[in-house]
Amino acid sequence: MPWHARLQLNYTREHARTVARFEHHGPLRVLQSLYPEGGGICHNVLVHPPGGLVGGDQLDIRASVGPGAHALITSAGATRFYRSMGAPVLQRTCLSLAPGARLEWLPLEALCYNACNAENRLTLTLAPGAECMGADVTALGLPHAGQPFVAGRFVQHIEIPGLWREHGVIDATDQRLLRSPLGLAGHCCMASLFFGAGSALSQARRDSALDAARAVIDAHALKTTAGATSPCDQVLVLRLLAPQVEPAMQLLRQVRAAWRAALWQLDAEPPRIWAM
């Protein structure tokens, strides 16, 4: 029987403190709120005890961040899309930010096992003055464990309505996409870090963030397969390809730290669970 799990997170600013409240149905919840940066920024960790998704499973994650609140959400482990012989798997995430809200959406990687049939959808709604930094890391198969991605299908959709939309369909039989230098060029990990704003970013802020990202990229081993751009005056995007997850995560976290400093004048302060 498929699992259908839902989680609703609501963040509000109360007396200079960001407070999290949540409701859940099924095996999806958050751990205790942490405040390593003080009361203004709330860190939460998503937990999905089954550890993976199979045919017909659905995860529905929704987070609402109120005016002036700042939330950081990560996950306790990778999202695992297992082999599926039947109905597709769907993970749907909807993030909504009120005026002046900030959110860091920083889940660990999604692992697409051989013969999976999965869709991962992320939608962000940003009010004027709201800002969100988000990460997406996808690994195709487990080639180092002798389980390459040679069958299956994965659909990836990321959207900030009216500003930016990315939609990709990866079919394991599409060798032109997987092997071509104009596609994934044989890499089994693709990742992006994005910064979206509900109001236009000044040219100075965009230039500062892009310069910071490019300096990190130039000093990294993945510099030939990574790049940072600004498709419009409300969005910044870092994209990269990697042979495996670890170097991709390393680069994303370094750029995230650089963007925190350049855009928000904040220290890196990685979630504690990343050190485990």
Swiss-Prot record:
What InterPro entries does this protein's entry cite?
A: UreD
Family annotation (Pfam families): UreD (PF01774)
Q: What is its main location?
A: cytoplasm
Q: Which keywords appear in this protein's UniProt record, sorted alphabetically?
A: Chaperone, Cytoplasm, Nickel insertion
Cellular-component GO terms for this entry: cytoplasm
Q: Where in the cell is it found?
A: Cytoplasm
Keyword Cytoplasm (UniProt): yes
Molecular function (GO) terms listed?
nickel cation binding
Family (UniProt): Belongs to the UreD family.
Q: What is the role of the protein in this entry?
A: Required for maturation of urease via the functional incorporation of the urease nickel metallocenter.
Summarize subunit and interaction data from the UniProt record for this chain: UreD, UreF and UreG form a complex that acts as a GTP-hydrolysis-dependent molecular chaperone, activating the urease apoprotein by helping to assemble the nickel containing metallocenter of UreC. The UreE protein probably delivers the nickel.
The record's listing under PANTHER family reads:
UREASE ACCESSORY PROTEIN D
- State what protein this is by name: Urease accessory protein UreD
What is the scientific name of the source organism? Verminephrobacter eiseniae (strain EF01-2)
